[in-house]
Structures are given as C-alpha cells and as structure tokens.
A protein has these predicted regions:
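Short N-terminal edge-element motif at the start of the domain
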Residues: 2-70
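Pocket-edge structural micro-motifs
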Residues: 43, 60, 80, 103, ...
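Compact nucleic-acid interaction/catalytic patches
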Residues: 50-53, 58-97
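C-terminal terminal-subdomain/extension
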Residues: 2-6, 17, 50, 89-239
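Generic "edge-of-domain/loop-turn" microfeature
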Residues: 46, 63-64, 83-85, 105-106, ...
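Generic hydrophobic, helix-prone segments enriched in Leu/Val/Ile
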Residues: 23, 76-78, 147, 151
Length: 239
C-alpha cells in the first residue's frame, strides 16, 4: 500500500503551531540540540573554500546526535535554510527536495518570514560552532517526524508514515524532553546545564537490575509518563 507525503494537521495558516516547539527567544537555553533545530550564522565552508555564516537546520538523525548521550558528535549533518514562499497542501506533497518552514521568522514582515530547508544543499559543520544563543527554532515531535519522512523520501523515494517514524523516534525525543525539564530545575539551583545533563543521562542509564535502564524503557510508550514523573521527583530531591 502506497502513502502520500503528509502535511501538518489543521489549516495551512496554523501549520506553524504544529511544526515548531518554540522559536527565537522562547526556546529554553537548556533545550538539548536536536534534529530539526534551526541555527543562524553557522559557519559553512563555501565552494571557494571561504567560510560564511549560513542559516542551517540540523538533519542528523536523533540516534546519531551524541556519542555518549551527553556530548554532541564532533561533526553534524545540516541542510541550508533559505527564503521560500509558503506551500499549499497540494504543493507540500510535491516539492520533495525541501521542507517548508512557514513563519520561521514570525516577526519579519519581508520575504524572510517564510523559509525552507533544502535537502540538496547539505553541509557537515563542527557541532561546537552551533551557538544555542543563535537557535531560531526547535521542531515539535510531529515536526521532526515530518522532516524525517521527507528526508527518507528524498533519498529513497519511499514514503514511511509518520506513525512508523514515531515508533522509532518517540523514546529519544522523550529523553530530550526529560533532559530539558531536568536542566531547567537544576538551573534554579544554580547548576550549569552541562553538569545537569550529565546527571540526568547518568540517572537515565542507571542499571535497575538485569541490565534494564530507564533510557531503554523510554522506547516503550507505556513507560514514558512514569519515567517523567520519576525524573521530576528526582530533581526535587536533588535540587
């Protein structure tokens, strides 16, 4: 059975609400860098060998973002983001080499307001050069799933449903949410984000017996709410 590329739910004029978890100053500084994050002024090596600042989106798969659960991989795959008009629902199912990012710059009144990430303009950048202070947007889980669907289709011409993508990305996205909440609680106690992240990952990876870890348990949707409650209780106890 074949499937069409999916659009965000709801009316096109409200797609931004479905795509973005947060934009601009609303992005918590302790939110872990994740697939779909958009950064401004990322240093990219041009065809002439010079370095120029570009707006880019992180395209690295969530499971390949970090080597140890804490620190980003040294180099990350990104796609260039550029101005692009808003697509209609019919066009969204076409234009397969890009993903539309309507209202990415919601405060802009020029054509810079609407943009798109282009899958045939890829770069590999040093992760240390991605400044979280210049992060323009984070995607919702649904937004990440739509991004991955379009990327897989661009590379393979196969459409994988977002429902199937959710089944394999849900755990790692939930982990990012838990780390964000943990680091926010720790920040109120004056704990640096890097140290709080290490604490959270260590807690998630603690052996509960027989090699069972909370991190692995997050792969099963049935366990997620319980682990989030336990994480909140742990931060109250620690901080």
């Amino acid at each position: 059975m074949s499937h069409d590329l999916e659009t965000p739910p709801g009316e096109p004029g409200r797609w931004a609400e479905q795509l973005y978890r947060a934009r601009g100053e609303a992005i918590p500084r302790w939110r872990p860098v994740f697939t779909g994050d958009v950064f401004d002024a990322a240093p990219v090596t041009t065809s002439s060998g010079t370095t120029a600042g570009r707006t880019v989106m992180v395209l690295q798969h969530p499971c390949a973002m970090r080597t140890d659960g804490v620190n980003l991989a040294t180099r990350l795959l990104v796609g260039e983001v550029s101005h692009h008009r808003v697509l209609t629902p019919e066009e969204w199912r076409g234009f397969t080499k890009l993903m539309s990012l309507p209202d990415l710059n919601s405060s802009a009144t020029s054509r810079k307001r609407h943009q798109a990430v282009v899958f045939d303009r890829l770069e590999v950048v040093d992760s240390s050069a991605l400044d979280v202070g210049r992060r323009l947007a984070c995607l919702t889980h649904a937004g990440v799933n739509l991004l991955l669907q379009r990327r897989v289709h661009y590379d393979t011409r196969v459409v994988v449903t977002t429902h199937d993508i959710q089944a394999v990305t849900g755990g790692v996205y939930e982990e990012a949410d838990i780390i964000e909440d943990w680091c926010e609680a720790a920040s109120l106690a004056g704990i640096e984000t890097s140290l709080a992240t290490e604490d959270c990952v260590a807690w998630l990876r603690a052996d509960l017996g027989g090699g069972l870890m909370r991190q692995r348990m997050l792969e099963d949707q049935q366990n997620r709410s319980g682990i989030r409650r336990a994480a909140r209780a742990e931060t109250v106890k620690r901080y």
